């Protein structure tokens, strides 16, 4: 017997993740989206440091929340659980990978502090750990999810390098959020074609 509807369950799952993390990554996504409205790298970096959220930031944050809820609600319970594990784990693994490999915007800030302490071996260990956890939850389907995380991380990092001159803590939050959304979209597509994809 189901206790509630898929939509309500998906909303609770997404909100629970936001509460547990303190909306840490959502805030980074919103700041990054706002900063993209600047005309020059210097202006974008200035906006990035502003903790207030503008229309771009709110739209990006709300859009990703709605997309995640819609994807999770479309999945069967077991598939939704596996997809959530993949999205949360590989999303953070993608952020670790970008943090360890991409140049920082500046030497100040939380992202720069973490990047200085993140050696190549720690980066590899973090990404490998994320892949291993996802493989335990999803089996061989870790492959498509890893590809989705990789493509989204490379795209966000490339845009950030061009727009800001590197990455920051906020941009790493954007990497994590975009990777989560990409993985959940892939999970929804797999579920529509392979009922036992997980």
Q: Model segments located where?
A:
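Hydrophobic alpha-helical transmembrane segments
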Residues: 1-22, 33-46, 50-198
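Juxtamembrane transmembrane-helix boundary signature
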Residues: 23-28
